[in-house]
């Protein structure tokens, strides 16, 4: 059932979200293939508005990259993945499902870095909902064939583990998903941080996503051509990323929360409140984290039954 989009947000929330969207749009439109994949001195990284890429933002803010890094922001998974497919970016922070979808289609990519993020189930404004069990037959916002789709389906089960019915509402862009929750047009949706905290600050109820379904599910996906042809830029990125991890661990958040505000569009009053994961230095994704997602994808017919993701997770080889 189609629902008409109505804005139910406060003026401040509209400004904070739309400001981030304008940054996303301007960043995307200012980059082209000729200035990214064909320039061996630059590395372009596609990102979504989530805390998965906070170490990259901090490294950028603190000047830890010795080679130029272009952070290219996207508002939806579809836009992000299209940019990697067309060579408009050298790499992107993506969920493991997106990585396997592209790899299964023959795109020459590697997943050498695991990222850390955060997600919460957020309930719509004015809804008498407080638990997963309350979501039976409710309208749930998601984007199809993404990690959110997977986590939603796996989360919405009864006490015996049997899936219960709900109405899927396709909403690709995360800020719009939050907007529809705030206006009461959606009953619930899984949102990444910082959007879950932004919603909570406006009175929306949130709970943890059950069974750690959204833990260990994102990484940095590189074009193989970029790894081969931009070795120095990739080395600079890895070194800068690791420096940022150490810096964040050794310094109070007040010293680097500006990255949350400037590059993630988080309102200043929330930058110190957002729950953050424990970020780790560059490390490979775990096969055990990919496997349940891959099985779900096979059951949905998203990848061939014979696809194993072999060769996708590979370390960056130092030159």
Which role does the model predict for each range below?
Residues 1-42, 319:
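Short, low-complexity disordered leader/linker segments with a strong preference
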Residues 36-164, 168-171, 180, 187-193, ...:
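Short, glycine-/small- and polar/acidic-enriched structural segments
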Residues 50, 78, 93, 142-147, ...:
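Soluble non-cytosolic domains of exported or imported proteins
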Residues 57, 100, 153, 197, ...:
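Predominant activation on well-ordered alpha-helical scaffold segments within soluble catalytic domains
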Residues 97, 127, 165-169, 173-260:
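Pocket-lining segment of extracytoplasmic ligand-binding domains
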Residues 228-304:
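Secondary-structure end/capping motifs
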Residues 298-319:
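Conserved C-terminal helix/tail region of periplasmic/extracytoplasmic solute-binding proteins
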